[in-house]
Amino acid sequence: MSSRPLLHVRGRILTGPGRDDEVHDDLWIIDGRISFTRPVSGGNSGGPNEPTVLTGWVLPGLVDAHCHVGLDAGGAVDRPTSERQALTDRDAGTLLIRDAGSPADTRWIDEREDLPRLVRAGRHIARTRRYIRNFAHEIEPGDLAAYVRREARRGDGWVKLVGDWIDRAEGDLTPCWPRWAVEEAIAAAHAEGARVTAHCFAEDSLRDLVEAGIDCVEHATGLTEETIPLFAERGVAIVPTLVNIGTFPRLAAGGEAKYPRWAEHMRRLHARRYETVGAARDAGIPIFAGTDAGGSLAHGLIADEVAELVRAGLPTGEALSAASWGARKWLGRPGLTEGAPADLVIYPEDPRVDVRVLAAPRHVVLRGRVVR
């Protein structure tokens, strides 16, 4: 007999962004997997095989495509802290995390059926003294490709570069790598079967990274009329992390006395953040939801990030897809499909009407068990 309960989920099962054939009235969870066929032994007889009934509007487990488990402002954290981070995300409905760089070994999470699934990018790779202390491998351009190969093998199909950061001599954001180095590094990652993403706040690193074949850019606040068409043409995705970009004025205020050019630059990027994301969306650039939790940001903010995407001009269905159906497809993970692992979130109201519903899940089901 299975240790997982038989569950019957009724209401509006949203298997896609809105077509009639993507909305079902119910599904069953049998041995931890989804079925749209009523089980022979489950029914309304009141017998021992009677399913537990859950009702509401149902989405696949949400995706946070930029989230750092195992990291806080000081660097790597211990297992109990990592566990609390993952549980906070889980209880907010995030059941799939693309961990966009962490110095901690979190492989043990894979053995825990009560914690979200992680897609790791290894450890950040940054230029020497050009990133947050204790976060990254800090290296020089000649070593970049070798470190990328190592992190590609350590991760789950992704590698994370730091594409730009403050240059203390210049007093502003500048690219971290010469063009030849990123070309070698991205080719090395692709040869290992990994995709590459990069932290980029400013404008100047973007063209080299995209023309070198990068797959995704984090934050992407420096997109312009010149680079948006290039991203769209190459199909390069962005993860705007708008809840993080919202902290730019505070960061600017803290660094203004020492780096006034950088502070003013950060304020400009912040001021046009919604316009930038809206223009990217209009151009057809793939956009996915990520909170940048870890470091200095709290975990469990995926509902806030989806709401920010709506403020930036994404229609509600697209914003939901950026954190569910579309994000799962992008990461190669199943949604609400026959036979898929039962990772889903149930809400008391329709999130397609108001994405703020995401902030208050009624139930969270992970691997076929109700965990909230």
Segments from the language model and where they lie:
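N-terminal metal-binding scaffold of metallo-dependent hydrolase/deaminase domains
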Residues: 1-45, 58-59, 349-354, 369-370
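Divalent-metal coordination cores built from histidine and acidic residues
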Residues: 59, 79-194, 227-229, 234-247, ...
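Active-site core of metal-dependent hydrolases
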Residues: 169-275, 288, 293-296, 313-315, ...
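His/Asp/Glu-enriched, well-ordered alpha-helical/loop segment
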Residues: 191, 270-350
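C-terminal cap of metal-dependent C-N hydrolases
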Residues: 15, 323-326, 338-372
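Divalent metal-coordination and catalytic microenvironments
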Residues: 11, 27, 32, 55, ...
